[in-house]
Structure formats: C-alpha cells, structure tokens
Amino acid sequence: MPNPSLGLLGLCIASVLLAGCSGAKTASPVQTPGAPIKPGTQWLEKGAALLQAKPPIDALNAYLDGFHFYNGQPAIQMEAHHYCAILNEDVIQCVIYDGSTATAKIMGVEYIIDQKLFARLPDKEKALWHSHGYEVSSGQLVAPGIPAPAEHALMKRLATTYGKTWHTWHTDQDQSLPMGVPQLMMGFTADGQADPAMVEQRNRRLGIDTTQTRKQRADIDIPTPDTGADSWQKGVVIQLNDPTGTHLHKPATTTPADTNSRSAR
C-alpha cells in the first residue's frame, strides 16, 4: 500500500525548496578545462532557459547531502549532493553533484527504492544496493534548508529505503574531466567508518550539529537491513574494472572549507 506521508511530504518539500532555501553553498573541488563561455553562447543559454520547457529538471525539488565511498575502497570517501525527484510513493531518483553551485559537476546518479520493492529483487541485484538506515540515524544524511519537522518526516521515510549509486565523474580524485569508467558506491552502516574530519568540514559549512541531529532522530524506527544489501560487509565486492587505470584511488588531501569535503586519512 502506498505511504501517504511521502506524497504529503513531497508537497511540503517542493513548497519550501522552491522558495529558495538551500543552506550554505558548496564549491566543486576541481576546475573544468576549456575556453570561457562566449557572449553568443550566453545568449543561447538564456534563450533556451526562457523558451524551452524542462519537466525532468523541474521535478528535482528535493536536496539531500550525505556521503559515499567506493565499493571495495571504504577509506576513499566523499560528500555527495543529491538533487532528487520523487517519482512515486516508493521510488526516488537523484542526480549527484560535487557541490551546490551552478558550476558543480555531475558526479553520478542514485536510485532509491522502498524496502517493499527491494525485497522483490533477485539476490545478485541486491548486492549492488546499500541501506539508508544508519545514514539517517547517525545524522550524516541531511536535507539542508528545510524546516526541522519536514526534514524529520523525510528521514523517517528514507530510513526504510535502499540506494543504488554510480559515480561517473570522480572529482574527489581531482579528475578535472569525467575520465575512467563508472564506479559503484556504497553508504556507511556503523560508527567509526566515516572520516570524522570530512563530516565535520561539511557540518561547519552547512551549520549542522550531527550529534544533536542524531538525538532528534532517536524516535525514528530503523529496520534491520535486508541481508542482501551492503554486501561489501560480507566480503562481496562488485566493481567495474577500469582499463584506463584511472581508479588507482590515490590518498586524497583535505579540501578548502567552502569546498566539497572528502576523506584524507
């Protein structure tokens, strides 16, 4: 049976976010090579913005900020900005950026489904997905800029979902262009996994207190994850081999305070 709270929540989120509340801005960690935009191109862009309808883009009315790591490389972590469209009561699709400015780079996509749909998936498919319960209960997953009651309702809904995430532009590895092949990403499932400095950098920039958020979410029921999800914890690591050698996963350094955070340990 569809969950009516998500439909109501979608209206709440849309009304708030369309008003422009999105919190502090986060810059991309890389500069894209290429010639500056010419006046003619600017006019073309402005004309397209005025004349062309963009229903799929207009549907991206929810903003989530959280963290991912490369499947098989749990120490290589980064902040991820999700701009999401609620397709129905049980399915959400998100475009993932490495920041929240107009020049942020598209890092990848995440598909989010409710536990009812996840339970129907074949076991081999489940291994590609990660649970969201800990991300919610820990306070690491946030919805910047919306009122606390709306965020709490959203997190209550997301606690029962699973995500499948692919990153295609690895700016956390200082790639100024989308090189290499897509990589499967995962989410944290327990304390001690996320780089605390990475989380703190994000928290300071967005004005978030994760400890306080965690307390406020103590009343959210977190289901036991399906045993087919988070397969990396069981030693089942699925990843695409990269013939270009791009994904050597070099240790990263910290980024400036106003820039997308990443692990550096």
Predicted regions and their residues:
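Alpha-helical membrane-anchoring segments
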Residues: K54-N61, G66-M78, A104-K105, I112-L117, ...
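Bacterial signal peptide processing site
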Residues: S22-A24
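Eukaryotic, polar/proline-rich low-complexity intrinsically disordered regions
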Residues: T161-T168, D172, S176, D191-D195, ...
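Bacterial N-terminal signal peptides that target proteins for export
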Residues: M1-L9
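N-terminal secretory signal peptides
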Residues: P33-D98
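An exposed acidic His-Trp-rich patch
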Residues: S100-M186, D191
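C-terminal motif of bacterial Sec signal peptides marking the signal peptidase cleavage site
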Residues: L17-G20
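A cross-kingdom marker for long, charged
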Residues: T213-R265
